[in-house]
């Protein structure tokens, strides 16, 4: 099932015009990571996509660390909603 980027933004935005908050960025990155993971399972030798996956995972990790330092409750809610370990 393909989830649209706009649906992800609407699900995690803080206000009507919010498209760049940390929660939205993490949600979008999580969706992209899931798609890349599925792609790499089918295409094991696609090393460029693998590098892109590592980049996205590390960016999400940095954003999660930032959110955890700034607002632990929002961090916990986001981890729970996205089914991430934490």
Swiss-Prot record:
Entry's Gene Ontology BP terms: translation
SUPFAM superfamilies: S15/NS1 RNA-binding domain
Keywords: Ribonucleoprotein, Ribosomal protein, RNA-binding, rRNA-binding
InterPro entries: Ribosomal_uS15, Ribosomal_uS15_bac-type, uS15_NS1_RNA-bd_sf
Coiled coil: none
UniProt keyword Ribosomal protein, yes or no: yes
Protein species of origin: Mycoplasma genitalium (strain ATCC 33530 / DSM 19775 / NCTC 10195 / G37)
PROSITE patterns registered for this protein in UniProt: RIBOSOMAL_S15
PANTHER family found in the cross-reference section: RIBOSOMAL PROTEIN S15, BACTERIAL AND ORGANELLAR, SMALL RIBOSOMAL SUBUNIT PROTEIN US15M
Pfam family for this entry, one: Ribosomal_S15
Protein name: Small ribosomal subunit protein uS15
Cellular-component GO terms for this entry: cytosolic small ribosomal subunit
Any one GO MF annotation of this record: structural constituent of ribosome
Assembly notes: Part of the 30S ribosomal subunit. Forms a bridge to the 50S subunit in the 70S ribosome, contacting the 23S rRNA.
Cited function: One of the primary rRNA binding proteins, it binds directly to 16S rRNA where it helps nucleate assembly of the platform of the 30S subunit by binding and bridging several RNA helices of the 16S rRNA.
Annotated Gene3D superfamilies: 6.10.250.3130, S15/NS1, RNA-binding (1.10.287.10)
Family recorded in the similarity comment: Belongs to the universal ribosomal protein uS15 family.
């Amino acid at each position: 099932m393909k989830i649209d980027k706009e649906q992800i933004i609407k699900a995690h935005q803080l206000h009507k015009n919010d498209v760049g908050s940390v929660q939205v960025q993490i949600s979008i990155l999580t969706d992209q990571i899931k798609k890349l993971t599925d792609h790499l399972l089918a295409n094991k030798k696609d090393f460029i996509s693998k590098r892109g996956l590592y980049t996205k995972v590390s960016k999400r990790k940095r954003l999660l660390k930032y959110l955890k330092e700034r607002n632990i409750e929002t961090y916990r809610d986001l981890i729970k909603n996205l089914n991430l370990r934490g």
